């Protein structure tokens, strides 16, 4: 299987834009990226993270499996709406159905690694069920080291393979904390940084984003992603 879980250290750290950037790099190298959002909350049909990736990249291989009305953790939103919880095995099988030779399935989680998607399971559980490695998207400012280290530690304790970190938003003129964090993130987490997304990249034109996305990452990012996800 070629499935990679895109998770984060929390909400609004840049997972969607990072997912789009990884998809662009994969496509440039001849792979067919396919984006899956297991659960979207607080967005009507036709909107949300998967459509945002399509708008940003032009890649229309994107599916949202479940939607819940309020912008909360998926399990909480499902409970409050009296809607059935997504089942782990069902979601895993749906994701596997998108996998095929030459394709890399990017699964964008909701919030952080341990956010409840179903009643009793998280994105970490989904990664383990799929046997899929994860990429952790993190913030880069003050407080980011603790969040990144906690997320990587939680993943490794569960036996998950962490491919690396992506800084979800890096300013043109980073402050002192951000500059220090760029040096310290790989040290405290024991995990490579695969790249940094420029601040505001989610508002770029599709043409600019697709052209510049490969420059966000280390040169061998595609090899790392495809080698570990096979």
Swiss-Prot record:
GO BP: any one term: biotin biosynthetic process
Record-listed substrate binding positions: 41
GO CC annotation, single: cytosol
Superkingdom classification of source: Bacteria
Record organism: Corynebacterium kroppenstedtii (strain DSM 44385 / JCM 11950 / CIP 105744 / CCUG 35717)
Cystine crosslinks: none
The protein, known as: ATP-dependent dethiobiotin synthetase BioD
Pathway terms, separated by semicolons: Cofactor biosynthesis; biotin biosynthesis; biotin from 7,8-diaminononanoate: step 1/2
Protein role: Catalyzes a mechanistically unusual reaction, the ATP-dependent insertion of CO2 between the N7 and N8 nitrogen atoms of 7,8-diaminopelargonic acid (DAPA, also called 7,8-diammoniononanoate) to form a ureido ring.
Active-site feature positions: 37
NCBIfam families in UniProt: bioD
Record field: catalytic activity: (7R,8S)-7,8-diammoniononanoate + CO2 + ATP = (4R,5S)-dethiobiotin + ADP + phosphate + 3 H(+)
Localization in the cell: Cytoplasm
Keyword Chaperone: no
tRNA processing as UniProt keyword: no
Cofactor(s) required, per the database record: Mg(2+)
SUPFAM superfamilies the UniProt entry points to: P-loop containing nucleoside triphosphate hydrolases
Gene3D superfamilies for this protein: P-loop containing nucleotide triphosphate hydrolases (3.40.50.300)
Pfam families: AAA_26 (PF13500)
Subunit organization: Homodimer.
This protein's UniProt keywords: ATP-binding, Biotin biosynthesis, Cytoplasm, Ligase, Magnesium, Metal-binding, Nucleotide-binding
EC number(s) recorded for this UniProt protein: 6.3.3.3
Family recorded in the similarity comment: Belongs to the dethiobiotin synthetase family.
